[in-house]
Amino acid sequence: MLKRRQPKYCSFMDSIDNSTTIIRKNLNRFIRELTDDGKLDFESIPYQNLQKEVANQDEEGCENVIEVLLDTTSRSGCPDRKLILQLFNSFFLQFPIFRENLLNDPSEFLELMFETNPIRNPLPGSKKHGNELKVEAITVIKSWEKEKCVKNDARMKCLVVTLKKTKFVDYENGAKKIEAERKRKKILEERKMKMIENSVNVYSSKYHEIKNDAETLSMELTTTMQMLVPSFTTADPEVPSTSTSTPSAISDSKSFEIFIPDLTPEISVSSENDAIVEAFLGAKLSLIHRVQTLRKLVKRLQLLKQPGEKLAQEIIDYRDGIKNLVLKADELRIINPRPPKNKRKKSDDDFIDVDISIDDILMVQYAEKLEVDVKSKDESEKITESPEKHKIEMKNEKPVKIKTVPFGLDLKYWGEERKDVEVPKNNADCHRFWRSADEGTVAGKAQQSIYTQRQYTFIGKAPDNRKVCLAKMKSGKLCPRKDYYTCPLHGKIVDRDDEGRPINEEDRLEENYRKEQNHLKEADKIRQMIEKEYESKTKRRKKHDVDTTASEDVRNRLQKKLLDPKTIQRVSADLDASRKNRLEKNFGQQFSHF
């Protein structure tokens, strides 16, 4: 039987698939084995294997490599795309075949790295990472532009021109903006570190101040403890002996057994050690307060993290030493401590101490005892009385008079700052859920001016400086009204003669002008009345004729035009069309929005 020959292209396709699989595996492994700072390790074994695969490829194999890189880029986020961009940069500068294939068709590369088509291929992730990727890509393209191998290449120039004309890429100023943002963040970090340093310095000065006080108090506490309970653990200095006793005599001395029921020392307060005990308790209480203050300082320093760790640890060590001293002082039992002496009031300074005899004291005590006996007897009698008698007494009693003040509240609280109780209005009192009143809705607030202002009256008769109007009326008489400045009918009061004419020329001209204006107003009113009567007779009356103002007329006219159904339909159609275009522009590639 004849064997069928396999076609040659099958073996070629298998080799391409194998190389593609190897490149993809090396690429994935290479991306997984990145360093923590986001930079590629060009000395790693996966990178060397990937470099060998690219170097061994021909033109078709190189196209396959670019396809694998672009496919991986499309499925990766912006941080991984920055790493793949470094691979593109490395292969572009090392292998001419890779460079030629990439420059022949850079459209997909530009879409994935520069977001030249944000509707079709938007950058994934946050906007911050996208801007960083764009800046990195612009830096790479600018470095390619300066290379000798592609400096005079028309394709490279077209690529740069395309990026400059694209409105989605700021090719000229993109790096400058990122640099300005980086400088701004650096300034903020420096300012933050300076504030932290100042805080640490403040806490350090506070700690040293507390430390100086605590050392003084510790010395005082230790001294008083040694005075109250002498320490027998320290070795006493050797005292030279004057006796002629020999060591054999010392060895022959008798031994004693001492039984101590409780090792906790007890101190009974007496007149001899009263001052020492008081100083001991005061020093211990002050040290407890210092320990609490140091604890608060440590909590605040822990919020600063690394800059305040050293000082916080120093404070903790010092605080533990003070705490041990306070715990040691707590072991002392003080029996019958004297209560603290009451401070003398300032009002007692005006009194003089007078010696009272024992007879006077006995008389006062006897009088107090008699008063107590009388009160107890009255209470027992009231209990035994009948309830009817008690009711009769209640009726006979006069009502208690309410105390009144013979002057107003303004004098009672004169010069004092008083805040009256505010009664909030609850706007939601009819709702089934209670909520607090809104701000600004407070009622029942009394006027504060009544406590700071007062009207004073003067005794005597005020001089009558009122003038007579003397303006001529329609009846021919002169106006007899009196007032200080103006007459309610004729206006300003001026000097007039016996016939009612103003004496001054200016006042006479002003009065003539006022009369002319009044005549014009009356003529205008008569004209309006005549026109209205004529219109009412000739003009057809509307069905619902309502008198409206000018602003209401404008509102009605605009309402008639804007709220027309055809106008609303036309405007809503335009708004829907613009909204649909905006959605299609931003989310056209996502079917879930339509």
UniProtKB/Swiss-Prot annotation:
It holds the Pfam family DUF2043. Residues 544-558 have a biased composition (Basic and acidic residues). Disulfide bonds: none annotated. Residues 533-558 are annotated as: Disordered. One of its GO terms (biological process) is response to UV. It comes from the Eukaryota. InterPro entries: UVSSA, UVSSA_C, UVSSA_N_a-solenoid_rpt. Residues 170-198, 503-540 form a coiled coil. The keyword Metal-binding applies. Zn(2+) binds at residues 469, 479, 487, 490. One of its GO terms (cellular component) is chromosome. Residues 24-170 are annotated as: VHS-like. GO terms for molecular function: RNA polymerase II complex binding. It is found in: Chromosome. Belongs to the UVSSA family. Factor involved in transcription-coupled nucleotide excision repair (TC-NER) in response to UV damage. TC-NER allows RNA polymerase II-blocking lesions to be rapidly removed from the transcribed strand of active genes. This is UV-stimulated scaffold protein A homolog.
